[in-house]
């Protein structure tokens, strides 16, 4: 099980402050305090399918339930900040408006987060946080039926 092998389990998720596509300022994990939250993080456009594979099933199962939250966090190097309006505009056009509040694009020092979480930026990553922002599950790349079951089971246990 992930709890036995992953050093991130039990750690507080590092703070990310950024603007959502709905143009609200969000600070993760604080913006979701009191909720069980899936945070899906990607550093490459090519990882989008991986995030969708985690977020889609989670949102389908928990998205309308009270006490749950989810965020998709594209992490973009500060060097692309000058393209922010074009990048965010493209994402807004391609993502349904009701999902905009859940997409929080961070422009900045991405290496800070890859080091803090000891993750490989070539993959998308899914972090399930408890109500206090502590990491209780972590997945990388595409999920399989077993990892989705573990994610769901962990979320349901946290909800009790």
What name fits each language-model region?
Residues 1-14:
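N-proximal helix/coil linker or "cap" segments that precede and/or mark the start of modular domains
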Residues 16-36:
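A short beta-strand-turn-helix
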Residues 45-47, 76-80, 110, 135, ...:
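Solvent-exposed loop/turn segments at secondary-structure junctions
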Residues 46-96:
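Structural microenvironment flanking redox-active thiols in thiol-disulfide oxidoreductases
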Residues 38-42, 72:
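Structural cue for short, hydrophobic secondary-structure segments
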Residues 79-122:
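Thioredoxin-like thiol-disulfide oxidoreductase module
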Residues 115, 121-160:
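Thiol-/selenol-based redox modules, centered on thioredoxin-like
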Residues 34-36, 66-69, 124, 131-132:
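Loop/turn elements at helix/coil->beta-strand transitions in domains of secreted/extracellular proteins
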């Amino acid at each position: 099980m992930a709890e036995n092998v992953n050093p991130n389990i039990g750690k507080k998720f590092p703070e990310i402050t950024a603007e959502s596509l709905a143009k609200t300022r969000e600070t993760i994990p604080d913006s979701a305090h009191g909720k069980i939250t899936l945070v899906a993080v990607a550093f490459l456009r090519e990882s989008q399918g991986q995030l969708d594979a985690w977020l889609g099933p989670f949102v389908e199962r928990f998205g309308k339930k009270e006490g749950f939250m989810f965020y998709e966090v594209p992490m973009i190097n500060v060097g692309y900040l000058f393209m922010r309006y074009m990048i965010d505009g493209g994402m807004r056009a391609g993502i349904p408006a009701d999902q905009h509040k859940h997409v929080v694009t961070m422009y900045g020092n991405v290496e800070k987060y890859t080091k803090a979480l000891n993750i490989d930026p070539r993959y998308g990553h899914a972090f399930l946080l408890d109500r206090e922002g502590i990491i209780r599950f972590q997945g990388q790349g595409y999920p399989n039926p077993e990892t989705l079951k573990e994610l769901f089971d962990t979320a349901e246990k946290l909800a009790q």
